[in-house]
Amino acid sequence: MGVLKTDEWLKVSLKNPLEICRKIKKLFQEDSEQRVYNYLARNGMYKYNARIQNDFAKLLENKVWDKVEGFFKRYKKLWDGPNIPIFIFPHGSAGFFHSNKGNKSGLAFKDKMFLFYTPGLSDRELEAVFVHEYHHVCRLNFLKKEINDYTLLDSIILEGLAEHAVLKNVGVSFLAEWTRFYSSDAALKLGTKYIKPHLQLRKNDDLHDQLLYGLGRFPKMIGYSCGFHAVTKRKKNKYISEIATLTKPSEYFLEDYFKD
């Protein structure tokens, strides 16, 4: 499948994202395009305003759809990844996680992927978002675990491994800002307090996302940061191939991180 022609959809329905979501609601086993749109908008999809028309034109001018198709072909071969549909839309500024993920973001599932971009991103910045999200897609498929069985442990390691894929394939300059929020010592100290007691928390528990993203009273992006530093420490102590980052269980990457 690869990159779908959402640019053609946007040429017709840019002002009406609900019409776009009507096309994809079956992929979410959902009968309401409004609920699909609300979910996507919380995670980065645009809300139409005067700026979006210009943003879309610049994304077209930058040939973003063609570039992402090139990334897909490369990494699908490199990681023996699944052939999934990829949806590209302009990024909005009012997403729930906007302050944590800046002017670009994505969503990954076993069977589909969404990328939300603003104009002005370099090719390497475009690639970094793609690599992070497609690494998720590949790992979700290789692990063969039902999404409702995922725990906070699985989630933090998923994020840490994906950002290490960015480090390896795109470069240190293109790591997400959250990788620099805490030093390794600070992340370990905070993780021991907030993350360690809840590693087996299921994904559908409200506390899961609060800890993963560092919402409310919790340190900002502490789950993400802990996962990144745990993988960093594991890689320092033991060689891990890139394919192993897709197939090894989460527990493997947390060995010796939280020491009693």
Where do the language-model regions lie?
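N-terminal low-structure segments adjacent to metalloprotease catalytic domains
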Residues: 1-49, 53-55, 59
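Auxiliary, metal-adjacent structural segments of Zn-dependent hydrolase domains
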Residues: 49-109, 123
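Short pre-active-site segment immediately N-terminal to the catalytic Zn-binding motif
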Residues: 114-129
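Hydrophobic (often cysteine-bearing) scaffold residues that line and stabilize catalytic clefts
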Residues: 127, 154, 158, 223
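Post-HExxH zinc-binding segment in Zn-dependent metallohydrolases
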Residues: 150-189, 259-260
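Pan-zinc metallopeptidase signature
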Residues: 196-260
